[in-house]
Amino acid sequence: MGILNNKVAIITGAGRGIGMETALLFAKEGAKIVVNDLGANPDGSGHEKIADEVVAEIKALGGDAVANYDSVDSYKGGMNIFSTAMDAYGAVDIVINNAGILRDKTLFNMEESDWDAIMAVHLKGHFNCTQPFVRYIRETNRLN
């Protein structure tokens, strides 16, 4: 096993790209993974359960993973992601806030709703996913 043996990692935006590669690497190093991905394309269109594909790949490599489809843009979504980890593994050791969206427009052409969507995922999403983890760390005295 690797340096993350039996650690539990939540990785948001893990259905594609950097998040997926991080999930695969962590799994190879022995971590149990919560693969979170809403399943939308970076521009917000579509909805596929791509997290299932990453979970299947991790399991094919001998790892352990579960999928989660909640959006990081709401506090409830962040709590549900954390709950998925606790329900599946009983602990959380690592949170990687990787989820992101793209509104490929210049500021001149951007609507306020585009800006709000980006901030909800890229900024508030970090808070929504990290706060339950930080509270858990403090409440379980895992600061060391």
Language model features with spans:
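Canonical Rossmann dinucleotide-binding motif of NAD(H)/NADP(H)-dependent dehydrogenases/reductases
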Residues: 2-34
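A glycine-rich helix->loop->beta "capping" turn
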Residues: 61-64, 84-97, 103
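Conserved glycine-rich Rossmann-like NAD(P)H-binding loop of the short-chain dehydrogenase/reductase
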Residues: 29-53
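The beta1-alpha1 cofactor-binding region of Rossmann-like NAD(H)/NADP(H)-dependent oxidoreductases
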Residues: 48, 69-80, 112
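Rossmann-fold cofactor-recognition segment
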Residues: 56-75
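Substrate-binding pocket helix/loop in short-chain dehydrogenase/reductase
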Residues: 58, 106-107, 114-116
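A short, exposed helix-loop element centered on a Lys and neighboring polar residues
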Residues: 130-131
